[in-house]
Amino acid sequence: MRSILVLVALIGCIAAGVYKIPLKRITPPMIKMLRAGTWETYVEGMRKRQLQLLKEHKVHIQDVLGYANMEYLGEITIGTPQQKFLVVLDTGSSNLWVPDDSCYKEKRPDRCLVSNCDAGLVCQVFCPDPKCCEHTREFKQVNACKDKHRFDQKNSNTYVKTNKTWAIAYGTGDARGFFGRDTVRLGAEGKDQLVINDTWFGQAEHIAEFFSNTFLDGILGLAFQELSEGGVAPPIIRAIDLGLLDQPIFTVYFENVGDKEGVYGGVFTWGGLDPDHCEDEVTYEQLTEATYWQFRLKGVSSKNFSSTAGWEAISDTGTSLNGAPRGILRSIARQYNGQYVASQGLYVVDCSKNVTVDVTIGDRNYTMTAKNLVLEIQADICIMAFFEMDMFIGPAWILGDPFIREYCNIHDIEKKRIGFAAVKH
């Protein structure tokens, strides 16, 4: 009996390891919309929806900009044989979901998406195909899945069906579907993948129209299970429960590549630190709440402005901007003659301004510099990498990609703490 126990222990040790998933940097949809002149229309629609969500008590942190400013994507696979998906690795949410094969069918023609195909007699008379008059709500919403990788459960011999459904409200629409269980692999096929068997994931039957304008297929949530829709275990929690990692941690490194698109953008390291990109000294801060990666931010300063009011903050890999209270941002903007553009919800600043912001977490100050805080939209037109958080429920600050490009984030799931280490230059 003892020999069997020793063998099991040895197998567990062999199975545990450290894995890496490289990231691809894309231009955030927000930046593309600003350049195309469509951002203000997007913001108007988003604000109307968010007010409705607030009334219905459905607002989550991931709703703030509806993934309009996500910047880094990684590759995962689901099923056996493997089916590929590009996902946002998002510490601001907890569910893994990808489009299901049922989300789009070729038999639902694009001609059904014209305005004359609304329900009723008008549809029957004027629509180019009478079949479009049936289930018109579906016809109008399927297009977002058309060009996505979609999961086909019939093609996976490790798939397990469940009877649970899910729905997540975003700032610009929603995603909904049902849960399945299958083998999830973090990393591209043929690479050194973290293989997580029998993992819950969402199969989206519908995704908001906004997602049709993005490269992503789905979302890989990396926050805690308490935040998960349906209460299902996030894949990384499942991996830790199965003893697949050397340590119950993961490390995030984002590389500053300017405005380049489709290039290497950093790496997630599962089960260990990242000595190749992060300095050895790590300062940890205990989480105040283990739902998001939430902690106390003691103070902020920039040039002649400072405040030690103290706020709740989260680290969020799914946003290319930082979020902060309105009063704080307006005080910071004044230091650099920045102007708030209400219709855009953003702060315009001279591209030559050396915007720096220090935040205090625990006993340490962390500096964000102009290379990460001043974003060029067009020639001689720049914005500060911040948005206002005042209308949202929850933490007052989001430290997003501008902060993570300065400091590697080490997420300690077991000890419920987050660590920060300076990026190597």
Curated annotation (Swiss-Prot):
Q: Does the keyword Protease apply?
A: yes
Among InterPro entries, the record links this protein to: Aspartic_peptidase_A1, Aspartic_peptidase_AS, Pepsin-like_dom, PEPTIDASE_A1, Peptidase_aspartic_dom_sf
For this protein, the record's PROSITE patterns field holds:
ASP_PROTEASE, PEPTIDASE_A1
Disulfide links within the chain:
103-145, 351-382
Question: EC number(s)?
Answer: 3.4.23.-
Activity's sensitivity to pH is recorded as: Optimum pH is 5.
Where is the secretion signal located? 1-16
Q: Where does the record say carbohydrate is attached?
A: 163, 197, 304, 354, 365
Q: Name one GO cellular component term.
A: lysosome
Q: Which UniProt keywords apply?
A: Aspartyl protease, Disulfide bond, Glycoprotein, Hydrolase, Protease, Secreted, Signal, Zymogen
Question: Where do the Peptidase A1 domain residues begin and end?
Answer: 72-421
Source organism superkingdom: Eukaryota
**What is the protein's given name?**
Aspartic protease 2
Species of origin reads Necator americanus (Human hookworm)
Query: In the UniProt record, what gene is named as encoding this protein?
Result: apr-2
